[in-house]
Regions:
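C-terminal helical subdomain
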Residues: 188-189, 196, 208-253
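Conserved glycine-rich cofactor-binding loop
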Residues: 15-16
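Residue(s) in the substrate-gating loop at a strand-loop-helix junction
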Residues: 148
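Conserved glycine-rich Rossmann-like NAD(P)H-binding loop of the short-chain dehydrogenase/reductase
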Residues: 31-46
């Protein structure tokens, strides 16, 4: 396994859950990490933890659904940390419920963050990642897009969320085909049920539905997903892990 010494990673949605755990894991592997989210107080606390463990962190408060803000995140990372080798597109939102009475603004939020925000960050980062693949000691770079089992299996009540995650999968594989021969690896990580804040943005009746669906199940921890991401980006140059599907042992779908 290669280390990430001398590299820089940018992690979106880093204020909690998978993003927070991933930033800590990448920093522990040697990367300088730019942590991006809207909740600056949480990012500041995360940066303190990274630096207390001997790492380097850059806090960027931003909403990546704004294309200009997403681009500015990337440019600030390169300006202050010197380069960009790894992009982890983790920011996302899951808003579930039957189609019949669904608030349309929830669809807009999911499309804007889960799809467009991810694309904005990728578009801004790509020139820097291509450069890193040419001039870094690793001679490769990585884009890791966090999807979901919902990008493979559709369920009643989650149609728009499914659509965004199926879309992330299609975008990721198309991009992979474009850049793989230039040694930018594109990986899709698809978690099942994870104990994070993700479901907490839903309406009370939806939260009850989710609780019943996973009642008694030992869910994944954010660190389980962070371990998988770190594994992906620390493979030797000739190894590209294009997909990781990771569920709790007891989860059927």
């Amino acid at each position: 396994m290669s280390t990430l010494d001398g590299t820089t990673a940018l992690v979106t949605g880093a204020s909690s859950g998978i993003g927070e755990a991933t930033a800590l894991s990448l920093a522990a592997s040697g990367a300088a990490v730019a942590v991006v989210a809207r909740r600056k107080d949480r990012l500041d606390a995360l940066a303190e933890r990274i630096e207390a463990q001997g790492g380097r962190a850059l806090v960027i408060e931003a909403d990546v659904t704004d294309e200009a803000a997403a681009r500015a995140c990337v440019e600030q990372t390169v300006q202050e940390l010197g380069r960009l080798d790894v992009l982890v597109n983790n920011a996302g939102v899951m808003l579930l419920g039957p189609m019949e009475h669904a608030p349309v603004e929830e669809w807009q939020r999911m499309v804007e963050l889960n799809v467009l925000g991810l694309m904005y960050c990728t578009h801004a980062a790509l020139p820097h990642l291509l450069r890193a693949a040419e001039d870094s000691d690793r001679r490769c770079a990585d884009i890791v897009n966090i999807s979901s089992v919902a990008g493979r299996v559709a369920r009643a009540g989650s149609g728009v969320y499914n659509a965004t995650k199926f879309g992330v999968g299609a975008f990721s594989d198309s991009l992979r085909q474009e850049v793989t021969q230039r040694h930018v690896r594109v990986s899709l990580v698809e978690p099942g049920a994870v104990s994070t804040e993700l479901a907490g943005h839903n309406r009370p009746e939806v939260l009850e539905m989710i609780a019943k669906r996973f009642e008694g199940m030992e869910r994944l921890a954010s660190e389980d997903i962070a371990d998988a991401i770190t594994y992906v980006v620390t493979r030797p140059r000739h190894v590209a892990v294009n997909e990781v599907l990771i569920r709790p042992t007891e989860q059927q779908q």
